[in-house]
Amino acid sequence: MEYRRVKDQESYDVVSQKDIESPGERSLSSTSATSSLSTAGASKGKNSWKLKSIVTLALTLLTSSQAILIVWSKRAGKYEYSVTTANFSVEALKCLLSLIALYRTWNSQGVTEDNRLSTSFDEVSVYPIPAILYMVKNLLQYYIFAYVDAPAYQILKNLNIISTGVLYRIILKKKLSEIQWAAFILLCAGCTTAQLNPSSDHVLQTPIQGWVMAIVMALLSGFAGVYTEAIIKKRPSRNINVQNFWLYIFGMLFNLVAICVQDFDAVMNKGFFHGYSFITVLMILNHALSGIAVSMVMKYADNIVKVYSTSVAMLLTAVVSVFLFGFHLSLAFFLGSTVVSVSVYLHSVGKPQPQK
């Protein structure tokens, strides 16, 4: 009996000690839980910002080297390869990269409703429109150099900045503030000023075909970009690689039709990869990675960010050209760079405030 009383007293002492310590422990536990949630939220926000930054930087770097690779892929002033097969190769490579990314997702997360390839007709039926628009725009990108030189092309390319802003307002019904509209105008002025040099006078002598192609490219680029963003963001939880896969599948189909219509005999007689060089392969790889980067910018940022990325890339191209081609950067370039920097800042701080 005495032994039992001793054991009961020991048990009581242990329980009492736990009761004394438990309020502090519960407080510490609660604080730890709150801290963990705050850390998780901050980590998620940091990761999101990091992803946006990486994708935007990648798009800027890829776009800045795009024009250089297109020019380098020429031989004796012309393309010895078929531009339709090059476009098809770009779409095929993008499709392959999307499948590889999906395969890794399936291995790590399993197949879910949001990352499975199977889809409904309603979902997939919207992809042919941007696919055919991108195909035409990409083909025009090669042919416009028959009518304009590189500086003139860079200046005319700024037309898509305005078309994107207008279509962004019309299609996505998203309001742009007066400051943002002013930023668009400044951006056009800045990019144009930065590209001015003695040869830029040729832009006034550009044949009507060159002007028409530049305007059509601007409209196609703006409409396809905004329309694609609307599709991608319509179902935010949908895996971006699944959305890309279906867009690129239709891109392959339309480019295959273009090959049959335009270069069928040449491909049959000389081969699909006739005239390809190492620079051509680099150009195709660049276009493929650029396309994926654009879609990720649309998914995790917006099409306006894409426009500013490509605009900054134009200035980067000019800087790189100093080392590659010995180009001289005039005062106009530095003035234009300053104006572009100001426009980027105005666009960032001029976003419409949500109504309370």
UniProtKB/Swiss-Prot annotation:
Membrane topology, record value: Multi-pass membrane protein
Lumenal side: 74-82, 147-149, 197-211, 261-277, 336-356
GO biological process terms, semicolon-separated: transmembrane transport
Cellular location(s): Golgi apparatus membrane
Annotated transmembrane regions: 53-73, 83-103, 126-146, 150-172, 176-196, 212-232, 240-260, 278-298, 315-335
Keyword DNA-binding applies: no
Similarity section: Belongs to the nucleotide-sugar transporter family. CMP-Sialate:CMP antiporter (TC 2.A.7.12) subfamily.
The protein, known as: CMP-sialic acid transporter 2
Organism of origin: Oryza sativa subsp. japonica
The encoding gene: CSTLP2
